[in-house]
């Protein structure tokens, strides 16, 4: 769930769009639109700068961190375990959301118009909701996989391979996200100047349809996957803290196996908790806004909505730090990648610095040759003239 899925546009114009469906207030709404558009360049300038700074920081950190996670997993064959491949799938989803939808979401807070065309008006909310579904479904699948490995280590594992699991996750996420793509429309608003907006137009009655779609998305995208994940991890925690490790012959081996699995479990649980905390305020905001009895204008507090939206989008940044903090192999792989990157950059700069004196020397020699040739030609010309 996010602003795309619900068509949230925190401005007086959108309040007017809701009001015009309920009462004949077109004159007042036209006045509100004109006043808001005239005052916006002055009133929103500090907020716009803050939006650009915060969302830009999210994009930079997420692109660097999630690309690093994908590199660590796919570069080393030892890191391509089933859990790590699903973690990389989660990183790919976060990376795609960062590059494809977060800039569009931020632009809706900054621009009066929708300059991206009708195709992106349909595609942007679909991709946004799909990527969130992929995140929650991936976390639930990882939890089920850990449950089958730790709670029943001697039982034949019946979960499908990682590539099939990823295909199932993306297919189910896309199917569940379809309702958020079919109702978007590019509409024209005529005030003192024409505007183009990407808005959601639900079938009648639109208010009721939006309520139940919001509730259904909240349950399938947030409540059910995270509840299943919590149940699986609670059972896994009980198993880890109450029995000895299988196959360990000494106390030191038992302690090492148990400590390793507990640390891995802490990492996965922290990833889920971080996601849940980041997305809970925005989901509650949508539910309260759509189910409140009094549908007044105070529910559209744009600054509050932007903060909740930014908090939800920032969830794409934290996982790489959690992996490097609680997983030694991830940390070693990330350090090796960064060391190689810095070393290659240093070698490139050193090569360029060594090439500069040589190029300057060659330029100096060519200049001397040209001046010598020029002086020789002048001397020969003077001799010819004197003769």
Can you describe what each PLM-predicted range is?
Residues 1-42, 191-192, 245-262, 328-387:
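Intrinsically disordered regulatory tails of 7TM GPCRs
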Residues 31-41, 109, 113-125, 129-130, ...:
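Loop architecture of class A 7-transmembrane GPCRs
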Residues 44-56, 82-142, 148-159:
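Extracellular TM2-ECL1-early TM3 structural module of rhodopsin-like
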Residues 47-75:
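First transmembrane helix
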Residues 55, 72, 96-112, 125, ...:
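Helix-to-loop junction signature of class
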Residues 63-74, 102, 130-153, 165-167, ...:
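Cytoplasm-facing ends of alpha-helical transmembrane segments in multi-pass membrane proteins
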Residues 75-85, 146-165, 230, 234-267, ...:
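Intracellular signaling interfaces of 7-transmembrane GPCRs
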Residues 198-201, 205-206, 218-221, 238-278, ...:
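Intracellular effector-coupling site of seven-transmembrane GPCRs
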